[in-house]
Amino acid sequence: MAVIEYEGTDISAQVAVSRCVWDAREEGRVPRLSLRFDDAQGLWDSWAAKPGDRIAVAAEGAAATGTMYVKRISPIAGGYEIEADALPVPDTPAVREWRQTTFKVVAGELAAVLGLRAVFHGCEDMPFAYVRQDAQGALPVLAKLCMLAGCTFDVYDGTAHVCARDWAASQESTGTLEVAASSEYEYRTQRAYTLCTINQTAIAGTRAGIVASYGEAGFELAAKLDETIGMLGTSEMKRACAGMLACANARRSGGYVKSDSLSPYSPGSVCTVECAKAPSLSGLAIVTRVRNDFENKTSKTWWRKIA
């Protein structure tokens, strides 16, 4: 049975849950929690629940949701629906600018705006000439910077975990993800990019144009930096090319498996995939997304192999 805590109080025995699904991803997607309580007697309304309240779900053998924050409460026939996510405060569009700064400085400040603490794992502090948040939320800016710096990040329990991709791939396995012959599963692989070229166009009086590449000739990924990011020079551009190349290739392969049990993994976990029917899929992998259905005790786990 799942344990549901609302504002620090265990309410599991006081509510009849008909839906409880936690969906968490890496790559800067915010974990979400969707619940439905059957409440024929109208008790829930007397609790004065409101957006911003804290809620958490845990179950034996499953990854816990960590603290989530209510974003929407909807009375429905015979009950209530609650939607929550892992951000303590909404990601409100804003205009901010940093000059002669570094990746960790900007990432830390963007996380703080969201009510999060940034923790860096194996990340180099990449310099930037300037970064501008241009009437948009903090999350997309942070995601872009992480991509250029060769990092990914996920949000969990009040913390933005920013991980260098090579650091994440070097971690030891924390367990086994079994893909049984009877399981519903899929894995896709697309051709990997071998070269990334980035063109930073010149802006009069602001920056010079820079073109840089990383990799080997073959299947090229070409990109442009918009006016919200300014690099210091060619060496930094090459690092950005490497980061963008790694990010693009990570998205070109991956799979999932459905299970009749809850997943113990959270995004970013390293595990060992065992697939008897397709041994080529077996080996070390990084979990990229988890969807735990606490009420039906089922899960869907997405992963990508570590080359």
Show where each model-derived region lies.
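Short solvent-exposed loop/turn micro-motifs enriched in small/polar/acidic residues
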Residues: A48, G66, K144-L148, T189-R191
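Assembly/oligomerization scaffold segments
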Residues: M1-D91, A180-S182, G254
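Short beta-strand and beta-hairpin "edge-sheet" elements
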Residues: A56-E83, T272-K297, W302
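Short, surface-exposed ligand-recognition loops at beta-strand->loop->(often short) alpha-helix junctions
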Residues: D38, G42-W44, W98-T101, D260-S263
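Acidic, small/polar-enriched beta strand-loop surface segments
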Residues: M1-G8, A143, V155-D157, A164-T298
